[in-house]
């Protein structure tokens, strides 16, 4: 059974008199920076010249530097940039300033695990990964709560890397909810698998297939949207609150019976075989190489897929329906 660690397990004194540079000020960046600041940590932000986020960070009371200057000034560097740009920013702006004793950290293990970034042996390399979007990390912190985090050590040059990672997790509010120890490999591979097979890829494909099946059978697209997309959140909320059993306890007997008898016909042995194949592609580095090459070539396929998906009929139906939801307008 995995062990969870809480506030009493983290020691913020390990970050006392240290300067933490948050590289990037997007969803996670703003949450990490503000939470650490409110925890009494000295925080600076590193952004590229002309970044639109600089004004937001400064208005929040943070000092903004170039990425290179922030990396030079900091004892702890947290890279919170998109995976595909981290390597170039690291090589050009951060690596030259990685002096012995510093900490290099990430919120996702992709670039370390797949060898895109290779740090010098004289620095600690850790990961602190909140299991929620940045706005939730920030909001729960201000409410005296937190979002659970994963933490991991890739390289322990100081002998304190693990304790330092736990201290950082406490600084952003993670230990209020609980933090779980993992490895860069485990976090990276399970995260990619979850995104591709269940949370993003699998769910999106399932929603579209269900929607299209109903529309092709002559049902109103609006009804198909409600049944196959809109109500997903209602079911997922029940699952998050108490697992599959809680969801099944909350739905009708008709729905529950259909769940047991028809659901397994959707996820077949062939589906599970594809899941294993996708996992192997992740484990072997095939997906990582594909993603890196796609970005190096200017994202032609990625851009085309984005455009094609944005034009799917479900998007137009959803846009029109949501415009009529009075409760959504108020929210």
Curated annotation (Swiss-Prot):
Annotated NADP(+) binding sites: 25-28, 51, 53, 83-86, 134
EC number: 1.1.1.86
Lineage: Bacteria, Bacillati, Cyanobacteriota, Cyanophyceae, Oscillatoriophycideae
PANTHER family assigned to the protein according to its UniProt record, in alphabetical order: KETOL-ACID REDUCTOISOMERASE, MITOCHONDRIAL (PTHR21371:SF1)
Free-text comment on the cofactor: Binds 2 magnesium ions per subunit.
Ranges for domain KARI N-terminal Rossmann: 2-182
InterPro entries hit by this protein: 6-PGluconate_DH-like_C_sf (IPR008927), KARI (IPR013023), KARI_C (IPR000506), KARI_N (IPR013116), KARI_prok (IPR014359), NAD(P)-bd_dom_sf (IPR036291)
Sequence similarity: Belongs to the ketol-acid reductoisomerase family.
Cofactor(s) required for function per UniProt: Mg(2+)
Residues holding Mg(2+) 1: 191, 195
PROSITE patterns on file: KARI_C, KARI_N
Domain named KARI C-terminal knotted: residues: 183-328
Record carries keyword Oxidoreductase: yes
Lyase found in the keyword field: no
List of catalytic residues: 108
Name recorded for this polypeptide: Ketol-acid reductoisomerase (NADP(+))
Reaction equation(s) it catalyzes: (2R)-2,3-dihydroxy-3-methylbutanoate + NADP(+) = (2S)-2-acetolactate + NADPH + H(+); (2R,3R)-2,3-dihydroxy-3-methylpentanoate + NADP(+) = (S)-2-ethyl-2-hydroxy-3-oxobutanoate + NADPH + H(+)
Cellular-component GO terms for this entry: cytosol
Keywords (A to Z) from UniProt: Amino-acid biosynthesis, Branched-chain amino acid biosynthesis, Magnesium, Metal-binding, NADP, Oxidoreductase
Job of this protein: Involved in the biosynthesis of branched-chain amino acids (BCAA). Catalyzes an alkyl-migration followed by a ketol-acid reduction of (S)-2-acetolactate (S2AL) to yield (R)-2,3-dihydroxy-isovalerate. In the isomerase reaction, S2AL is rearranged via a Mg-dependent methyl migration to produce 3-hydroxy-3-methyl-2-ketobutyrate (HMKB). In the reductase reaction, this 2-ketoacid undergoes a metal-dependent reduction by NADPH to yield (R)-2,3-dihydroxy-isovalerate.
Molecular-function GO terms, alphabetical: ketol-acid reductoisomerase activity; magnesium ion binding; NADP binding
Residues reported in the UniProt entry to bind Mg(2+) 2: 191, 227, 231
């Amino acid at each position: 059974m995995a062990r969870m660690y809480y506030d009493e397990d983290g020691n913020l004194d390990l970050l006392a008199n240290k300067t933490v540079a948050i590289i990037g000020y997007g969803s996670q960046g703003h949450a990490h920076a503000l939470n650490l600041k409110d925890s009494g940590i000295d925080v600076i932000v590193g952004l590229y010249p002309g970044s639109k986020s600089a004004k937001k960070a400064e208005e929040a009371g943070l000092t903004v530097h170039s990425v290179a200057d922030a990396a030079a000034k900091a004892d702890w560097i947290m890279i919170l940039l998109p995976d595909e740009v981290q390597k170039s920013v690291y090589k050009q702006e951060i690596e030259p300033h990685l002096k012995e004793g510093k900490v290099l950290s990430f919120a996702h293990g992709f670039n370390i695990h797949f060898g895109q970034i290779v740090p010098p042996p004289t620095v600690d390399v850790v990961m602190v990964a909140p299991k929620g979007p940045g706005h939730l990390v920030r909001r729960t912190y201000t409410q005296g709560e937190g979002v659970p985090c994963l933490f991991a050590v890739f390289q322990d040059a100081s002998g304190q890397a693990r304790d330092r990672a736990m201290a950082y997790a406490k600084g952003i509010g993670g230990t209020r909810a609980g933090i779980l120890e993992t490895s860069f490999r485990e976090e990276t591979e399970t995260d990619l698998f979850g995104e591709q097979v269940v949370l993003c890829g699998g769910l999106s494909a399932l929603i579209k297939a269900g929607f299209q099946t109903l529309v092709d059978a002559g049902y109103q697209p609006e009804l198909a949207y409600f049944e196959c997309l809109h109500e997903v959140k209602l079911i997922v909320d029940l699952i998050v609150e108490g697992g599959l059993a809680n969801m099944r306890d909350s739905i009708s007997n008709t729905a529950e019976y259909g769940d047991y008898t028809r659901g397994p016909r959707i996820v077949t042995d062939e589906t599970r075989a594809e899941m294993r194949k996708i996992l192997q592609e992740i484990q072997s580095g095939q997906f990582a190489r594909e993603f890196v090459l796609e970005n190096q070539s200017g994202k032609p396929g990625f851009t085309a897929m984005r455009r094609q998906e944005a034009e799917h009929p479900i998007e137009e139906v959803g846009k029109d329906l949501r415009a009529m939801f009075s409760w959504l307008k108020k929210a």
